[in-house]
Amino acid sequence: MSLVILGVDPGSRITGFGVVRVANGKIEHINHGVIVMDGDDAFPRRMTELGSAFREVMEKYKPEQVVIEKIFLGKNADSAFKLGHARGVIMYEAGLGGAEVQEYATRSVKKGVTGNGGASKEDVQAILKVMLSLKTISRIDASDALAMACYHAFEMKKKALMQRAVSL
């Protein structure tokens, strides 16, 4: 049995995505990329572009699980609100596509993938290249999304092992 997981690094201008398949306990890279919205467009138009492009990704890869970064409040409240809108568009489209949506904090993902919750984006990318046997990952946004997908696969495996251990 295999499971397709789509990781998403949401953004109001650039959204990264990473698709992996989990089969027989192994994580296989399927694809990764970015959805780039026209920065000159008004914000509502960018959200429409994001929805349309993300729907195409959902239709192409048909993931059972979509994993998205939890929102965090930085110094700029406007950026956090825009990120919230992008997350909403993605969650809506994921739900329409029949996928279950999971959320993880960035720090948890970094710790799960690299062993260090404060790892740099470049460190995460380097580990993923080795883990998934990739020569390059074109954009940091895409590697962040792949990290989300891989971390979810780790968490699912951990939960399955715990359930087996409890039933012994």
Curated annotation (Swiss-Prot):
UniProt GO BP: DNA recombination; DNA repair
Q: Which reaction does it catalyse?
A: Endonucleolytic cleavage at a junction such as a reciprocal single-stranded crossover between two homologous DNA duplexes (Holliday junction)
Lineage of producing organism: Bacteria, Pseudomonadati, Bdellovibrionota, Bdellovibrionia, Bdellovibrionales
Assembly and partners are described as: Homodimer which binds Holliday junction (HJ) DNA. The HJ becomes 2-fold symmetrical on binding to RuvC with unstacked arms; it has a different conformation from HJ DNA in complex with RuvA. In the full resolvosome a probable DNA-RuvA(4)-RuvB(12)-RuvC(2) complex forms which resolves the HJ.
Catalytic residue list: 9, 69, 141
User: Is Cytoplasm found in the keyword set?
Assistant: yes
Q: Where, subcellularly, is it found?
A: Cytoplasm
GO molecular function annotations of the record: crossover junction DNA endonuclease activity; DNA binding; magnesium ion binding
Q: Which residues take part in binding Mg(2+) 1?
A: 9, 141
Where along the chain is Mg(2+) 2 bound?
69
The note on cofactor binding and number reads: Binds 2 Mg(2+) ion per subunit.
Q: List, alphabetically, the Gene3D superfamilies matched.
A: Ribonuclease H-like superfamily/Ribonuclease H
Gene Ontology terms: cellular component: cytoplasm; Holliday junction resolvase complex
Per the record, the similarity remark reads: Belongs to the RuvC family.
Q: Can you say what this protein is called? A: Crossover junction endodeoxyribonuclease RuvC
- Keywords associated with the record: Cytoplasm, DNA damage, DNA recombination, DNA repair, DNA-binding, Endonuclease, Hydrolase, Magnesium, Metal-binding, Nuclease
Q: Which Pfam families match?
A: RuvC
Cofactor(s), by name: Mg(2+)
Task performed by this protein: The RuvA-RuvB-RuvC complex processes Holliday junction (HJ) DNA during genetic recombination and DNA repair. Endonuclease that resolves HJ intermediates. Cleaves cruciform DNA by making single-stranded nicks across the HJ at symmetrical positions within the homologous arms, yielding a 5'-phosphate and a 3'-hydroxyl group; requires a central core of homology in the junction. The consensus cleavage sequence is 5'-(A/T)TT(C/G)-3'. Cleavage occurs on the 3'-side of the TT dinucleotide at the point of strand exchange.
* E.C. number: 3.1.21.10
